[in-house]
Amino acid sequence: MFTNIFNKAIIKTIFFLIITYIALLSKIDKVFSQVIDSKYYDWTVYEFQESEFDYKKCYIVSHPQKIDSDDNSRKKPYLMITRYQKNRSEEVSVFGGYEFKTSGEIFLVIDAFQFHLKAKGDMAWAQSRYDDISLIETLLNSAVVRIRSDSAHGKYAIDEYSLKGITLAYLRMKEICR
């Protein structure tokens, strides 16, 4: 009789553990992963949250439509605007696909405007919050941006990004990361 009660307790415990495991797996899908929220022409909106207790990070990303580069080993570059839910701030960054030249600057040309981003490793960022705001405003009101960068190995790249869809993607990013 004691064995029968003990076996039932083990079966109940195993059943409870299986149900708990399944419940945790369903939550893991949403936590520790980036989720594509939507796509607007050349721009994709992503949402990221490390845990259900953390603030979200949302970002929009685009890849170049045209690439002029003498580096065949280069990874796929991208232009990104990130919004942090916690402090409701936005940041522009560029992934070059290679290590940028040490102490190098990345040049963004949008219409008649030129912006300089500070490079570190394979990423580059605007130099201040004010520059981020100004750059985002210019991106939202333009059609094309060209980005010129130099690699740490003496290679170069000029990437041309379409800004078609950036305004809708930006508004959606702000909506989901309020």
Predicted regions and their residues:
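Acidic/proline-rich low-complexity IDRs
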Residues: 1, 16, 23-24
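C-terminal segment of classical bacterial N-terminal signal peptides
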Residues: 20-30
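N-terminal secretory signal peptides that target proteins for export/translocation
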Residues: 1-11
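Sec-dependent signal peptide hydrophobic core
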Residues: 10, 14-19
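A generic "folded-domain core" signal
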Residues: 31-178
